[in-house]
Amino acid sequence: MGEMEIEEIEAVLEKIWDLHDKLSDEIHLISKSHFLKSVKPSNRSEKRKNPHGNSGEDKRPGYVFIKGFAVDDNDSTIQEAKSLNAIRTALENLEDQLEFFHTIHTQQRTEKDVAIARLEQSRILLAMRLAEHHGKNYGVLEEALAFVGSIKSNSHYVSPDHLYDSSRNPDGANSIPDGIESNFVINAFASTFGFAKRALGFNHVKGVLGNAAIFAISVVAMLHLHQVATSEHHLQKKEDRFYRSQQRKTYGRDKSSADRSLDHLDVMMARG
């Protein structure tokens, strides 16, 4: 049969159901017609000629099983109905196998979409870590940024160079503007929402309950991503405070030593 998409499988199933209904209608018409012929009363002249005849032999068998009527397998109408019934049975078997294939294909696509969603979240997280790097601009970081790709923002895309270079403040540290950060969160949430919708097969689900379920899954995914990002951000802030504190202490000691040397020099100069 080859590779088929879920939409194609559903279209084939609908065609099978339509053919099944039409076959059932034809079988019903044949059965009904044959039954009416089998129970049709004989004319009065035949009854007068053979008033004591065997009624069982005069009765014509019908296809629909009725108590008191036998089925004649040699009747062409019966053979036609049986042939249609065999075709309908084979069609039902094809329907069962196609539904099984549809179920397996749906599960595989769902698992694939979930894996893609996790991969996309990991890519976004790696790009965030590279963009938030504080310190020297290593060549390997630029190479990694180019490899990861750009992150969506309000201006459609933010290139790795823009994230790395233009976000530097005068002190030489990297910082992401609030607008870019908020836009990134919004777009990341929208991306997660779309992946969750496709992953769970809710493309055809409408209404409040379906949208609420998709929204809840997206929120959980974004909260997990935000928790990881927040913990890393707090750790970086602590390190920055520690480095600034160490710099102030070092600067204070150097200044105090210079002041003492200057005072001593002034005293010596005053002595003449």
UniProtKB/Swiss-Prot annotation:
One of its GO terms (molecular function) is phosphatidylinositol-4-phosphate binding. Residues 40-61 are annotated as: Disordered. The chain crosses the membrane at residues 207-225. Residues 226-272 are chloroplast intermembrane. Residues 78-102 form a coiled coil. It is a single-pass membrane protein. Induction: Induced by gibberellic acid (GA). Residues 1-206 are cytoplasmic. GO terms for cellular component: chloroplast outer membrane. Expressed in young developing leaves, root tips, shoot apices, and flower buds (sepals, petals, stamens, and pistils), but not in developed tissues. Component of the plastid division machinery. Required to mediate the dissociation of ARC5/DRP5B from plastid outer envelope membranes (OEMs) at the midplastid constriction site in the cytoplasm, thus triggering ARC5/DRP5B ring turnover at the chloroplast division site. Binding to phosphatidylinositol 4-phosphate (PI4P) modulates negatively chloroplast division. Interacts (via C-terminus) with CDP1/PARC6 (via C-terminus). Interacts with ARC5/DRP5B. This is Plastid division protein PDV1. It comes from Arabidopsis thaliana.
